[in-house]
UniProtKB/Swiss-Prot annotation:
Coiled-coil positions: none
Compartments, as annotated in UniProt: Nucleus
Keywords: Nucleus, Transcription, Transcription regulation
Organismal lineage: Eukaryota, Metazoa, Chordata, Craniata, Vertebrata
Pfam families in the cross-refs: TFIIA_gamma_C (PF02751), TFIIA_gamma_N (PF02268)
Protein name: Transcription initiation factor IIA subunit 2
Family: Belongs to the TFIIA subunit 2 family.
């Protein structure tokens, strides 16, 4: 099973809403919707690992951190994100980072 972090993105939420609508109108079964979501999990993890090449630097004050079940969670305050010419400042950011070395086992 691949990480399901990206289901809570705009793309993931739109997919889930569309699948829910198809289930309600009985055009697909809940089992098929689950298979679609599992395929989405695999595809988005693979695409982000292999296709994204942009880099962003960020700096902020660490508020809290946690490591549980090979998942790091960081909460940062007063964060600055810098790309080549852009600067974005935000009050608070939560970063969830999963062990990429274990995704081979998780993606089956």
């Amino acid at each position: 099973m691949a990480y399901q972090l990206y289901r809570n993105t705009t793309l993931g939420n739109s997919l889930q809403e569309s699948l829910d609508e198809l289930i309600q109108t009985q055009q697909i079964t809940p089992q098929l919707a689950l298979q679609v979501l599992l395929q989405f999990d695999k595809a988005i993890n693979t695409a982000l690992a292999n296709r994204v090449r942009n880099r962003v630097n960020f700096k902020g004050s660490l508020n809290t951190y946690r490591f549980c079940d090979n998942v790091w969670t960081f909460v940062l305050n007063d964060v600055e994100f810098r790309e080549v010419t852009d600067l974005v400042k935000v009050d608070k950011v939560k970063i969830v980072a999963c062990d990429g070395k274990n995704t081979g086992n998780a993606a089956e």
